[in-house]
Amino acid sequence: MPLSRTLSVSSLPGLEDWEDEFDLENSVLFEVAWEVANKVGGIYTVLQTKAKVTGDEWGDNYFLVGPYTEQGVRTQVELLEPPTPALKRTLDSMNSKGCKVYFGRWLIEGGPLVVLLDVGASAWALERWKGELWDTCNIGVPWYDREANDAVLFGFLTTWFLGEFLAQNEEKPHVVAHFHEWLAGIGLCLCRARRLPVATIFTTHATLLGRYLCAGAVDFYNNLENFNVDKEAGERQIYHRYCMERAAAHCAHVFTTVSQITAIEAQHLLKRKPDIVTPNGLNVKKFSAMHEFQNLHAQSKARIQEFVRGHFYGHLDFNLDKTLYFFIAGRYEFSNKGADVFLEALARLNYLLRVNGSEQTVVAFFIMPARTNNFNVETLKGQAVRKQLWDTANTVKEKFGRKLYESLLVGSLPDMNKMLDKEDFTMMKRAIFATQRQSFPPVCTHNMLDDSSDPILTTIRRIGLFNSSADRVKVIFHPEFLSSTSPLLPVDYEEFVRGCHLGVFPSYYEPWGYTPAECTVMGIPSISTNLSGFGCFMEEHIADPSAYGIYILDRRFRSLDDSCSQLTSFLYSFCQQSRRQRIIQRNRTERLSDLLDWKYLGRYYMSARHMALAKAFPDHFTYEPHEADATQGYRYPRPASVPPSPSLSRHSSPHQSEDEEEPRDGLPEEDGERYDEDEEAAKDRRNIRAPEWPRRASCTSSSGGSKRSNSVDTSSLSTPSEPLSPASSLGEERN
């Protein structure tokens, strides 16, 4: 079923303008997730980046609840004494009854307070709690599924903590508990089963069954309504996990997902329509001048070029100044992440560049962690050879410079035949001989444990991209997370992204997609799909995404072969751009970062919490969603200049990096369109804050503050049949 644009649950103008009148003085927020100070996947990034904006709203009444891990506490958490007597009594009570509960400050931006529950120390109660879970929720958990057993322990400990916290407070606060993913969902179900006075929110960042089904090469999105979910979950031996996730979704006062595409998925697989969509954001750090991030791109690109010089030693027969760096990164899910489509498109791009005699070279990086045992010896040797050449060149340069200096010092021109002696030539010849090798540069930087069956390497063998001299597309598979301490490519992920020209993420299953969002914030164009949350969000809010360096690949309504052809077209068109066009496009891409800032996207979470308070405490809070008029639909406009990446445009100020100057292809200035980057940037930044909508009373807090609305019938809030989005914008259909 196609995405509906008539009812938008992620439209910026649909959000209420909350003011300080909404009283949170006697309210406490607990955000519960398995990835609090415990990096496992993308939820860690969500919590880490969102902590500051949430802390600004809730102050000292904001706490994160997660599992205790020795590594996480040692490197990320400062252990502290609880700041309030009630919280201290809560922890003391639990610790005296056989639990181990720790309190501290997570050392990230915003410095939120965290409560860490030691799951392993409570394993003595596992069987009893599993029995209670069966009696209460009819969910049985097998003994062999350690992850599910940990979820049971974590859920019961979380519920115990929340119940104890409420009991230790003489004046009962209004508690909001926000649970992320199925691993934390048991706690939500138990809160409702034990009738704790807690407003609950459940956010699914990706459905369990959806991820499994997409990995099985099924036509997922066109058959959503046809799946027998119980049968599919049972066949994949995840039925108990699926039950945990579905129960949490149905028990929550407010159910949210991270994107519209995941909302549709959840409606069919979890059988509840989300109340609101809460897109993921980032902490955007703006530069004081436009050229700063362009110069960072040039510096990071130079680091990547050093690696390429070593990796391709002996076959460095291409111009690095005419080389583009593409990359794909993420969890190693070959088809879900679109690595299969990317490889096929690279093979077709290689053919197009060769038959058209292009001087452009593309180096495509695959940054996907896989099972390895050590570095590839040939790759290490390449970096050693590069360093040896650099040392040789510096030695000869110093001797040459000293002789030149001495000659000029006595007032005579140097004799060029005496500037380099025989020893220097011998040293240089030995360095040249060291660069010779018979084999092609390696495709993989590490030795893989399952080389013969690895999906990426198997596909590369099939399509024949072996990094030969004739290939215009080179492939480098780096099956490890990037690190600035690596002996091969000593850069961290952020620096690597800044140095690349294009991020390619043709995912088939991507509920949100932080990787293209990170590219956008850093001013790097990216390719996403209309099956990713990020792609759908950008497609909805930008009139012409490609003009801003956001290319949306159609993987929903096209066949796999057609999608490969479209991706090839995107890549080839990008290769045809001049440096100047890429500079202008990077400027535009970076300006979109305002759309992804938590300062704006954090309001979706704010609205979800207000909705939950109104449902759980109808005598104290009321909530009425705001509906924008049809004329208030928000879309980021096309850039003022035409064409989208103008080759006939004049730069008004030196925003490009110093090493990316180039002539205007012989075109006189009067033939081109005047292009003022500062003026266009000012227009775009104004658009992110406009249009304004009329104020409407939407909330009441009887515990303090002034009245903002008449009370509403909260019975309509208890049914999840229709999304009560603060952003439900009845906008016109858009093509």
From Swiss-Prot:
Q: What SUPFAM superfamilies does the entry give? A: UDP-Glycosyltransferase/glycogen phosphorylase
Q: Which organism is it from?
A: Oryctolagus cuniculus (Rabbit)
Known EC number: 2.4.1.11
- InterPro entries per UniProt: Glycogen_synth
**Protein name (database record):** Glycogen [starch] synthase, muscle
Role: Glycogen synthase participates in the glycogen biosynthetic process along with glycogenin and glycogen branching enzyme. Extends the primer composed of a few glucose units formed by glycogenin by adding new glucose units to it. In this context, glycogen synthase transfers the glycosyl residue from UDP-Glc to the non-reducing end of alpha-1,4-glucan.
Q: Which reaction does it catalyse?
A: [(1->4)-alpha-D-glucosyl](n) + UDP-alpha-D-glucose = [(1->4)-alpha-D-glucosyl](n+1) + UDP + H(+)
TM segment ranges: none
The impact of changing S645A is: Does not affect PASK-mediated phosphorylation
What does the organism's lineage look like at the top?
A: Eukaryota, Metazoa, Chordata, Craniata, Vertebrata
Q: Where is the composition biased (Basic and acidic residues)?
A: 682-695
Segments of this protein annotated with the region Disordered: 629-735
What cellular component GO annotations does this protein have? skeletal muscle myofibril
Q: What class of enzyme is it?
A: transferase
Q: Name one GO molecular function term.
A: alpha-1,4-glucan glucosyltransferase (UDP-glucose donor) activity
Describe the PTM.
Phosphorylation at Ser-8 is required for modification of Ser-11 by casein kinase I.
Superkingdom of this entry's organism? Eukaryota
Modified residues annotated as Phosphothreonine in this record: T700, T719
| Binding positions for UDP per the UniProt entry | K39, R331, T515
An example Pfam family from this entry, by short name, is Glycogen_syn
Which Gene3D superfamilies does UniProt cross-reference here? Glycogen Phosphorylase B (3.40.50.2000)
Under the subunit heading, UniProt states: Part of the GYS1-GYG1 complex, a heterooctamer composed of a tetramer of GYS1 and 2 dimers of GYG1, where each GYS1 protomer binds to one GYG1 subunit (via GYG1 C-terminus); the GYS1 tetramer may dissociate from GYG1 dimers to continue glycogen polymerization on its own.
Give start-end positions of Acidic residues composition bias. Answer: 658-681
